From Swiss-Prot:
InterPro entries: Enolpyruvate_Tfrase_dom, Enolpyruvate_Tfrase_sf, EPSP_synthase, RNA3'P_cycl/enolpyr_Trfase_a/b. Keywords: Amino-acid biosynthesis, Aromatic amino acid biosynthesis, Cytoplasm, Transferase. PANTHER family: AROM/DEHYDROQUINATE SYNTHASE, PENTAFUNCTIONAL AROM POLYPEPTIDE. 3-phosphoshikimate binds at residues 20-21, 25, 157-159, 183, 297, 324. GO terms for cellular component: cytoplasm. The keyword Ion transport does not apply. One of its GO terms (molecular function) is 3-phosphoshikimate 1-carboxyvinyltransferase activity. The lineage of its organism: Archaea, Thermoproteota, Thermoprotei, Thermoproteales, Thermoproteaceae. This is 3-phosphoshikimate 1-carboxyvinyltransferase. It catalyses: 3-phosphoshikimate + phosphoenolpyruvate = 5-O-(1-carboxyvinyl)-3-phosphoshikimate + phosphate.
Length: 414
């Protein structure tokens, strides 16, 4: 798919994309329950479909009913082959849960996923007595778990820890996190969803303790996603418009919903009220310094408004962007440079100078957030921009390009 975008002014409102982070965790937890689970407002995304394929291999029956799914679990029937596409979350959480199976589970993925970190998680499972064949995808997992103590690095991806926490519900586990924990908000999210299902997760400094517990999820609606919604509201700042995203939970001031305050700190009018987040452009944006160690998915959103701000925007705490769908330290930099933006990156930071941007040719590196970032910058830039491989947004939000048209962006799809 090729998308062509010309300079626009974005006005209007759109519904918030549903959170795939929430959805994937709810779906996977439903597979280790002992009762039927109904989950509604499931996001239409490649990663969500990967999670559903994963739980079918874990023995669950999935029944689709409109925008809801019913999951009938049967962990005793787990086993088989599954391809999880490009979903790092499903890969890592799924590998951990597959360790509870007494039949082999073979997990595979696309070429982008085969380059992403997993070896440390596999080593931790081996230390728990799990039979693991392979050090990268495809990998064969054959449980059960025989130990209950594991140490694992926290500085590569928080998904290692989230996966082991979920496994702990089946077998009991004590996890010692070695080094800094990145993307902490996602471990907090895993813990929150588990506790809402009636189980508990103990945390004391760098040690996490999970006792065996059967999660029971009542009818659950997947909430809106701030990191994905941020690309819509960023359009208002890039184009001098006014955009409202509806259907979002009340911001808590940390994690992905900190975008509401980040935009305000940059000089924008950014207001949340009764589930709606409104952002108005047209005023003077200023460069800011922001640490995104706990919220790495916000980096492409902040980067999308940085060219339209005066001065320099500095994004820190982003070392682990190198291990995303693409090396985002490089792909954010390369994409912005194509628009004429002055960008420098180190091992743990991005420095972006406000610039007069022009149209660009972007060959998206199969990374949904890079495509979305490029779409925002293109809408605020002089001349025509062309984005190749634009269908990569389907990983998290199939409606992205349609929604941009709804907001008034001059966009054609070929």
């Amino acid at each position: 798919m090729i998308v062509r975008i010309n300079k626009s002014v974005a006005f209007g409102s759109v519904k918030a994309p549903r959170s795939k982070s929430w959805a994937i965790r709810l779906i996977l937890l439903s597979a280790i329950s002992d009762e039927e689970t109904t989950i509604c407002s499931i996001p239409d995304s490649d990663d969500t479909e990967a999670a559903l394929r994963m739980i079918e291999v874990l023995g669950s029956k999935v029944i689709r009913q409109g925008n809801c799914i019913r999951v009938i679990p049967n962990l005793r029937q787990c086993g088989g082959y599954v391809n999880v596409g490009g979903s790092g979350t499903v890969m890592r959480l799924g590998v951990a849960l597959a360790s509870s199976c007494r039949n082999p589970v073979i997990i595979d993925g696309d070429e982008t996923l085969k380059r992403r970190p997993i070896r440390e998680l596999l080593e931790s499972l081996r230390s728990l007595g799990v039979n693991v064949n392979g050090d990268s995808l495809p990998v064969a997992i054959n449980g059960p778990v025989k130990g209950n103590y594991v140490e694992i690095r926290g500085d590569l991806t928080s998904q290692y820890i989230s996966g082991l926490i979920m496994l702990g519900l089946v077998s009991g586990i004590t996890i010692r996190v070695i080094g800094d924990l990145v993307s902490r908000q996602y471990v907090d999210l895993t813990r929150r969803i588990i506790e809402e299902s009636g189980c508990s997760v103990g945390v004391s400094n760098d040690v996490i303790t999970v006792n065996e517990c059967i999660p029971r999820i009542s009818l659950s609606n997947v909430p809106g996603d701030y990191a994905l919604s941020g690309f819509y509201t960023a359009l208002a700042l890039a184009t001098g418009g006014l955009v409202t995203v509806t259907g979002l939970p009340k911001p808590l001031g940390y994690g992905d919903d900190s975008l509401v305050n980040i935009f305000s700190n940059a000089g924008a009018r950014s207001v949340f009220s009764n589930g709606d987040w409104s952002v108005e452009g047209g005023g003077e944006l200023r460069g800011i310094v922001v640490d995104l160690k706990d919220s790495p998915d916000l980096a492409p959103v902040v980067a999308s408004i940085a060219p339209f701000a005066s001065g320099e925007t500095v994004i820190t705490g982003v070392r682990h962007l190198a291990f995303k769908e693409s090396n985002r330290l490089e792909t954010i930099s390369d994409s912005l440079r194509a628009f004429g933006v002055n960008v420098n990156h180190g091992d743990d930071s991005l420095r972006i100078s406000g610039s007069i941007t022009h149209g660009a040719l972007i060959k998206c590196p199969n990374d949904h957030r890079i495509a979305m970032m490029s779409g925002v910058v293109a809408a605020g830039s002089n001349g025509e921009s062309i984005i190749h491989n634009a269908e990569c947004v389907n990983k998290s939000n199939r409606l992205f390009w349609r929604d941009l048209v709804k907001l008034g962006v001059k966009l054609t799809i070929n």
